Amino acid sequence: MIVGLIIALIVYAALVFYIGWSGYRGFGVKNKVFLIAYSIILGLLSISFILGRVVGGSTILTIIGNYWLAFFSLSLMILPVVQLIMLILRFTRLDRNKTRVTATILTLVILLSVLGYGSYLAYTPTVNSYSIKINKEYKQDLNVVMFSDMHFGYLSGAKHAERLVQEVNALKPDLIIIPGDIIDDDLDIVQEKDIFSILSGLEAPLGVYGSLGNHDRYRGNMDELITAIESSNMDILYDEGMIVDEGIVLIGRKDHSEGVRMETSELTAQFDEQLPIILLDHQPYQYAEAEAAGVDLVVSGHTHYGQIMPGNLITGALFENDWGYLQKGALHTIVSSGYGFWGPPIRIGSQSEIVQIHIDFDN
């Protein structure tokens, strides 16, 4: 593990040097003071994300570190393209130095513009709607609102939570379900920002229910974390289920990352299979098992739909359904791209979302 960490740090340092050297050469400023200042700033930026995660407790460091991570990732995608264009332009009569400086400035403008637009997509959720039919009886159609991956913490804070409550309540849901990653690893900062008090404003006649994800962690035991989250009037289903309104079965699984958890069939066996069954499972795995266990609808998150492209190509390869709706036999599956974000508050090729699900029954 130590060897792997050392190799990762060496590779990271080499990539930072590549970005830094490209920028330094591009600006064409041959000045010792500029070089020293440039190197110090680049060095501090390059360790800001690591320090923010390891040290913690600093909002400014966390913000800088996460935006640096986005800048770093986008630079690695854009710089090779720019340098290929510059190589081709060498065979023209254009002034090489002027072309290099112009290209560097344009690259920086493009990077900052993409970061700005990506931040807008991260903080401006859209509402995506689906209509499904479950061939079981229930007394009425349901308007269900689902959202996941809020990652409440330093960057997904009180204002983001307030907007969530406002937009969800405007949809007038009968039922609200939240399949995990409610917080971003740090319960203390969420409590400091009074997020759970804000979430208590969510309104649905049949209640608000959630399961936990891989980022819903706490230094204490899980009971303490669940108690804290449930102070928002949300019921957490932790490898357990319940009957809502005498006619709908809701089941929440432990996250896949916990390793040991009950099988879906063990959870559904506790209920009448004639009742509609909705499963909250943070990571979109084991659809065949869910269908065999009599589940009618699985809602998940986790993938963020890649968050920053081409990450969506990776999630598409890893998950059978990495975003949106997929039907497998009688099983309906819906995966959200998430309301929040992990790491940089940036989305490129995806957008933060709230999901509205209209369910029609044999009523």
Predicted regions and their residues:
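Soluble catalytic domains of enzymes that build or remodel membrane lipids, polysaccharides, and related
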Residues: 133-363
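N-terminal signal-anchor transmembrane helix
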Residues: 61-62, 89-110, 115-147, 153-166, ...
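Short N-terminal secondary-structure initiator segments
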Residues: 1-4, 117-130, 189-196, 221
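Non-catalytic terminal accessory segments
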Residues: 1-123
